[in-house]
Curated annotation (Swiss-Prot):
Annotated SUPFAM superfamilies: C-terminal domain of ProRS (SSF64586), Class II aaRS ABD-related (SSF52954), Class II aaRS and biotin synthetases (SSF55681)
Alphabetized SMART domains for the sequence: ProRS-C_1 (SM00946)
Organism: Pyrococcus furiosus (strain ATCC 43587 / DSM 3638 / JCM 8422 / Vc1)
Protein name: Proline--tRNA ligase
Family: Belongs to the class-II aminoacyl-tRNA synthetase family. ProS type 3 subfamily.
GO CC terms, sorted: aminoacyl-tRNA synthetase multienzyme complex; cytoplasm
Amino acid sequence: MVERKKWSENFSEWFNEVIEEAGILDKRYPVKGMNVWLPYGLKIMKNIEKFIHEEMERTDHQEVLFPALIPETEFQKEAEHIAGFEGEVFWVTHAGHEPLDVRLVLRPTSETAMYSMFALWIRSHADLPFKVYQIVNVYRYETKHTRPLIRVREISRFFEAHTAHADFEDAERQIKEDLEIFDNLMKKLAIAYVISKRPEWDKFPGAYYSLGAEVVMPDGRTLQIGTMHNYKQNFAKAYNILYEKEDGTHDYVHQTTFGMSERLLAAVIAIHGDDRGMVLPPTIAPIQVVIVPIPKKGSEEEVYSYAREIEEELKLAGIRVHLDLRDKRPGWKFYDWELKGVPVRIEVGPRDAAEKTVVLARRDKLEKITVSREELVDKVRELFDDIMQYLYERAKEWLESHIKRVDTIEEAKELFNDRRGIVEIPWCGEEECGLKMEEELEAKMLGIPYPEESARVEGKKCPVCGREAKFIARFARTY
């Protein structure tokens, strides 16, 4: 039976234990907020990134790789941007013993690194749309409590796509494409999420508007796992990114960005997990099937031989399989592979070897079935599909049950006291009222549902000022 008691009641402790014991990260590195990726964790992350690369290829983004250091002179060009980031950047002030004439910033994000180069590369309307991406390390001096994968000082798997367009309409089309890419990726991870348009006071520094994608974690807090920003011409004007139009005149480009990080893995671990550990979607599991031989005395040769045959058959079928021949008891191995979230376990004993059958145990529901050797590959593939569907449906049900709509501050407070995730409240649209609600609820406004039409509301009053509400606003306690 699947238990999620510790997972929900003591999520922080559960998460830290799983990260460590399942071999995802080692957080004992001697710089706070910087962690060491372990082989198993890195393999999962690389499998997630494989889907990102595929989506980038499909949508004609080109991969680039920019330096990690940005001169202070470039960093300062967009005033709103630097004001938003100045307090959380790492500065390089010396080279050897000598102070630098121009200080360098370890990139917190790459707008200021990339856009001086965009100004050199983009010349004409024929160069547009211009679409690039990279997956790099970025650095932010987080002063809050750091937490592996969730809040770190070195985001080591930071995906950022940067695009330039001839006009606002084409930039808007890009945002729609980003949302489609994100949705495709979330389907591969079996994750349900919401998209919100950030309030003016919480949009990305330098953006015209920002969108954020959130999931609800087991403790009721939300985790931002993706962002899309439309910059209009704000950065293009600061970095002089001009192009020649078809009529021979010049104009500034319109720009967008799209970002994700290892928080994707944090969401997978948190949302699909249970008290036994991780439950990985087969799409990204480094090991999709683990074979555990269970020989009795005198039957070792037959059982191991049969297990190797099964391993070979699954490998030939393109399934990522591992045969566990460690000198440990079967129960210990079951515990270990359940902790690591391997989607399907195959148990092979003397009777299975004799009767040409196998026992399949699925990690998500902790259920077992016996199947014949002939139907093994088909059955395993069928199980993968079933697991993906079950994980997504469970994640969707979890998310939907943690979004509640109320009319008053008092009702919202009660829900937050009960750790109920996202609370939706009518809002007049005025910043003063939004900030007042944040203060009263001790929660953050995620924004309004996106697309904006779905956020409009009629016949409701703003609980702060009593005026007619224009939107539904989402609030949450966040990471």
